[in-house]
C-alpha cells in the first residue's frame, strides 16, 4: 500500500482512466505468502494467516476504489457443487453447481459486496465468442445495478468502453502523460 500512497501524493492516478488488478486470485496468494514471512513452506493457518489476509485485501480494495479512476479487478472462478439428491435406483447424483469468486474464506462473499458491478466473462462455441454476464444466470453469480436500472442487458459484448457509453458514462481516454516521468517528482 505504500506504493499506492506515494502515487496518490504525486497525482499519478489522475492520469489514469482505468486501473486493473489482474488477478485478485493471484494477489491473494501473494498477500498470504507475505504475511507468512519466515514460515514459508508451511500450510497457512486460518486465524493467523487467512483472516488477516482477508482484512488486508478488503482494505486494499477499498483504497483502490477511492482512486480518481475506474477500477477493474479480475479473478478466477471456483466451481462449487451442492448435492441435492441421489436417485436410489440409478445412483445418479443431482447437484446444484455454481461458480464463485476464487479467493480465501469469507472473502468469497465479502469482496464482491464491495462492488456495484460484478460481471462474469463467458464464451460459447469454438473458437469461443466472448460475452459478459451482468446478471445471475444459472450457475454464474453476477450482478449489476446498471442492469437493474435498465441500462444493460443480461449478456453484453466484452467491451468496457461500450458498456460505459451505453450506461451514460464517459468512455473517453484521458490524455497521454507528458514525457517527464511522474515518479521523478518524488526524487
Which positions does each model-derived feature cover?
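Conserved GTP-binding G-domain of TRAFAC-class P-loop NTPases and closely related GTPase folds
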Residues: 79-187
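Short glycine-rich substrate-engagement loop in P-loop NTPases that contacts/grips substrate
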Residues: 1-12
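Conserved, well-folded catalytic cores of nucleic-acid-processing
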Residues: 7, 27-30, 74, 114, ...
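P-loop NTPase motor core
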Residues: 18-110
